[in-house]
Amino acid sequence: MGIDNSFERGERTLNELAGWSVDAETIRRLCHAEAAKCRRSKGQRLDIATRFEKAPGDWELQIDAGKVNTETGWRDVKVATFAVREPAESCSSEDFAQRELPRPSVRHVIAGIEPAEQFGLRCQSEAQRIDLPAVKSLTILGDGAEWIWNLAHDRFSGAQQNLDVYHATQYLADLARAGFAAEPKASQDWTGRAQTALVADGWAGVCAFVHESLPQMPDRPSLEAAYPRVANYLSGHQDRMQYASRLHRGASIGSGMIEGAIKQLVGRRIKQTGARWKTDSISPLVEFISLGHTEEWDTYWSAM
């Protein structure tokens, strides 16, 4: 109680299901105390390294951040998920949206409200704890936040980097809205075809597609006005757009796992009550909540 739902909800649930009278404040204190204990004992839990070693598939590190209201104002809680995932069936740029990506064989979440440099050290330390076999075997996936790629370069030099394909597509959608302002259906169709070009040939594919479609664009001046911003952004990530080769190998090209974690751990649980949280309490609680959705949860409690 208090992990997936508010402490007040936990109080009501315990009373309804077990007839126990435990107030929300007690549940809050116990949850935070156990979360802090769980983080302190992390170094003693060696089973996670064994799980990663035995897990079949490719290594991923997905990174993102979410906003949390703290006693010092709104802060970024940075979250990273290490995972090993078996490859999906090989597919092309035309049918990748329909492919079924296997669930991770194993995953592990870390979090921190701290500068990116410090969080990078946390990620590096965790990679060592779970026995990352070699940096070159790792793929780092994320959106366009500069701190993510600085972290990747500084702490995991040699790892493959992948810009989330759906994040990149949002920029293509901006172009479409500019060129098809009065035609939402046409805008959507154009975005889909632009995404196919992006996935097939990266930034070069986008350039060719935009050039070829200009004569048919209803509002060409607006698209041309919007293009420099999109070009400046996407061209800076062209080395992170090896989507076609990754699809051929059955690898991930999106960071949906970490975005889902942010939505579940931060958006749904941390923000749902509108409470202001103590900065020192957030990171251990986010990690503790995530533990509850993995096989580590049972192992953690069985060791008590």
Predicted regions and their residues:
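Catalytic center-proximal scaffold of phosphoryl-transfer enzymes
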Residues: 1-304
